[in-house]
UniProtKB/Swiss-Prot annotation:
Protein name: Histone H1-like protein HC2
Biased composition (Basic residues): 8-77
Keyword Repeat in record: yes
Pfam families to which the protein is assigned, alphabetical: HC2
Known function: Might have a role in establishing the nucleoid structure of elementary bodies.
GO MF entries: DNA binding; structural constituent of chromatin
Keyword RNA-binding tagged: no
Disordered: annotated span: 1-77
Family from the record: Belongs to the histone H1/H5 family. HCT subfamily.
GO aspect biological process, one term: chromosome condensation
Annotated coiled-coil segments of the chain: none
Gene field: hctB
Keywords in alphabetical order: DNA-binding, Repeat
Amino acid sequence: MIGAQKKQSGKKTASRAVRKPAKKVAAKRTVKKATVRKTAVKKPAVRKTAAKKTVAKKTTAKRTVRKTVAKKPAVKKVAAKRVVKKTVAKKTTAKRAVRKTVAKKPVARKTTVAKGSPKKAAACALACHKNHKHTSSCKRVCSSTATRKHGSKSRVRTAHGWRHQLIKMMSR
């Protein structure tokens, strides 16, 4: 019994394999008929021209709306001009107050420059070994090693200073 059942199942699969390609060919033929129907759908596209005529009627309705909008800005322009004139007058007064503060600032800068000059002379006097007042004009001459006087004052620059450390690193 078991052997007979296996033979029957084998016959069914063989018959199904033969029937499947026949169904696929029939399906392809139906698709070709659908392409013929698409040409019939293109004919109602000519009727859409009648719908375009109704669109032209809508433009006439829009023209009436534009006339009402044109009347509104004429009223707004009169109110806007009055407000602009008042604000411009206020802005000019504000700019005048700012210019007065700018004139005061250079006076404060002059005082800072005067304070900085004695600080530079005091700091440079330590590096100067000559018996005269150190100024910015003689800074290069006094700081050079060739014209420096040794003896009375202690040596300011040492071999372990950061300048000498850079010179040693560059020479290596």
